[in-house]
Swiss-Prot record:
GO molecular function: arginine-tRNA ligase activity; ATP binding
Subcellular location: Cytoplasm
Protein's recorded name: Arginine--tRNA ligase
Keyword Translocase: no
Organism of origin: Methylococcus capsulatus (strain ATCC 33009 / NCIMB 11132 / Bath)
Gene field: argS
Subunit relationships: Monomer.
Gene Ontology cellular-component terms listed: cytoplasm
TM region(s), chain numbering: none
Length: 586
């Protein structure tokens, strides 16, 4: 209905342009919102106030001109001018009821649109280092990124979901060294484990698998490993210096081939686990993009040459720097260290050049909130590469804190392992985890109440919404038990019988659903859809508790059944976009 009114307004404004009441080149701002007070109609437009200055006309007088130029439409009973120049639209109840027919005919497609016009959008999300299992912090980014991608797709965008695999660099070398040291323990070697190594049980598991499948292929004596190493932190040394020395020793003792085998054993095991974990969470990707491939294909070197040719690279203290301050960053960034090694940022520059070259109309990065300071340097790099930095949208996700009732849950074990996404999912289920993760704006702090998420009460929002869907299904089971059948066509012809306050409220809410999906997609804001579904469920539960559906009056019964079936369909559609199931029984 909102789109229909926009079309009417646009026609009226074109008529005023033709009549000379508006400049011919006047941009047409269309802002139509639902009214909060029914006394002010169903929709209101502030178009006259926005155009008054350029039209050199009093807003109320211009509103009258617009109103007079509006084409007739059977859905609009009347229009009124209110306040400083609002145009209020009063709609025919029967016309509003047609949303029930639309929902029935469109089914799962109701709420989808073509506003994105097929624009290609890449959504990169999670992209956690493959150095350990995903934890609950990654879970929020996974749920948020997946829903944003699904919403954009529902709005007509061509969405490409991508995970950037950080399979190169120092952290991966530390993982490989950690796996190797645990492997040596399996071989019977006794040696201290680095203070800065990866200590999780998953490292022991990878090492045990390596020993079981490869025997002692990678064995070296503990004496050879420890020879010449600096002191670790417990001995008064520097843990960073120590772990770097261990990595270097691992590479030297194993040699390139065997080191790469150990490296890949750790990477492949953890990456397989991440893929499985996200798949079970309902999160899927079109592409898993390897950071290592950027170096192996020469993409990093090519990106650096492009920055140099644009005049944004200089040398200082033996290193190569990106002059990002010239493009708004707070300080310049190192691209190549004095030892000749490229930085993580250099790989990121190459990765974003790759994104630009793939021709996406929009690039959406979902990052942890701690990466906020990283945004200016990446935008600066895109600009220096000759790209359009405005194509990049960075969406920040705050960490989630777990509670059980009022008691805060310990987020990590003694060895520093975080509560994993899999542990959370096993406790509360995929549906609750997905729903709770997107209930609030992504950049807002989030308290995740495990006790609430597993409760079967109206206070649990996901249960409350799913229960509304199940309740509708139960009504249709009761219909079958009575030996009755719904006459869908008769119900559609008798929609005027839906005149109770609860019914009119539900009809108005159902007609809002496409607008909510569009808003949630364009604003990257899944919480709008969550709030809508909670409100719709509340309205339905109120209707369920106050009205009988299976009445003797066949016309009224079928009209009401069509209404609640429309509610069921919209709830199912909305939950589907959130990656949450719509159960028929609970």
């Amino acid at each position: 209905m909102k789109k229909r009114l926009e079309t009417l307004l646009r026609s009226a404004l074109e008529r005023l342009k033709t009549a000379g009441d508006l400049p011919a080149d006047q941009e047409v701002p269309l802002q139509i919102e639902r009214t909060r007070d029914p006394a002010h109609g169903d929709f209101a437009a502030n178009t006259a106030m926005l155009l008054a200055k350029s039209a050199r006309c009093d807003p109320r007088r211009l509103a009258e001109k617009i109103r007079a130029a509006l084409p007739e439409d059977p859905a609009v009973i009347r229009t009124e001018i209110a306040g400083p120049g609002f145009i209020n639209f009063f709609l025919d109840a029967i016309a509003q009821h047609r949303v029930i027919t639309d929902i029935h005919s469109q089914g799962p497609g109701f709420g989808r649109s073509s506003i994105g016009a097929g624009q290609r959008v890449q959504v990169e999300f999670v992209s956690a280092n493959p150095t350990g299992p995903l934890h609950v912090g990654h879970g929020r980014g996974a749920a948020y990124g997946a829903v944003v991608a699904d919403l954009l797709e529902a709005a007509g965008f061509d969405v490409h979901r991508e995970y950037y695999v950080n399979d190169a660099g120092r952290q991966m070398d530390i993982l490989a060294a950690s796996v190797w040291l645990r492997y040596l323990e399996n071989c019977g070697e006794v040696l201290p484990f680095p203070a800065n190594g990866y200590r999780g049980e998953y490292v022991r598991d990878i090492a045990s698998d390596l020993y079981r499948t490869q025997g002692e292929r990678y064995r070296t004596s503990a004496d050879q490993v420890l020879l010449g190493l600096p002191p670790d932190e417990p001995q008064g040394g520097d843990k960073e210096e120590y772990i770097d020395a261990v990595v270097s020793k691992s590479k030297n003792l194993l040699g390139p081939e065997r080191y790469r085998e150990v490296f890949n054993a750790g990477l492949d095991s953890i990456l397989d686990d991440i893929r499985d974990d996200l798949g079970e969470f309902g999160t899927h990707y079109q592409e898993w993009f390897s950071e290592r491939s950027l170096t192996e294909t020469g993409a990093v070197e090519r990106a650096l040459e492009r920055l140099k040719s644009s005049g944004y690279v200089y040398e200082k203290d033996g290193a190569q720097w990106f002059a990002s301050t010239r493009l708004g960053d707070e300080k310049d960034r190192v691209l190549v260290r004095e030892n000749g090694q490229t930085t993580y940022f250099a790989s990121d520059v190459a990765y974003h050049l790759n994104k630009l070259e793939r021709g996406f109309d929009r690039i959406v990065n979902v990052w942890g909130a701690d990466h906020h300071g990283y945004i200016p340097r990446v935008k600066a790099a895109i600009q220096a590469l000759g790209g359009d930095a405005s194509k990049l949208e960075v969406l920040l996700v705050q960490f989630a804190v777990l509670y059980r009732g009022t008691e805060r849950v310990q987020m990590s074990t003694r060895s520093g392992e975080f509560v994993t996404l899999r542990q959370l999912r096993n406790e509360v289920g995929k549906d609750a985890a997905r729903f709770f993760y997107v209930m609030r704006k992504s950049d807002q702090h989030m308290d995740f109440d495990l006790k609430l998420a597993t409760s079967r009460t109206n206070e649990n929002p996901v249960y409350y919404v799913q229960y509304a869907h199940a309740r509708v299904c139960s009504v249709f089971r009761q219909l079958d038990e009575k030996g009755w059948a719904r006459d869908l066509g008769r119900g559609m012809r008798r929609l005027e019988r839906l005149c109770e306050p609860h019914e009119l409220t539900l009809v108005a809410s159902l007609s809002r659903y496409p607008e909510v999906v569009e808003q949630a997609a364009l604003q990257y804001a899944p919480h709008h859809l969550v709030h809508y579904l909670r409100d719709l469920a509340a309205e339905f539960h109120g209707y369920y508790n106050s009205c009988q559906f299976l009445v003797e009056d066949g016309d009224l019964r079928d009209a009401r059944l069509n209404l609640i079936d429309a509610v069921r369909q919209v709830i199912a559609n909305g939950l589907g976009l959130l990656g949450v199931s719509a159960p028929e029984t609970m």
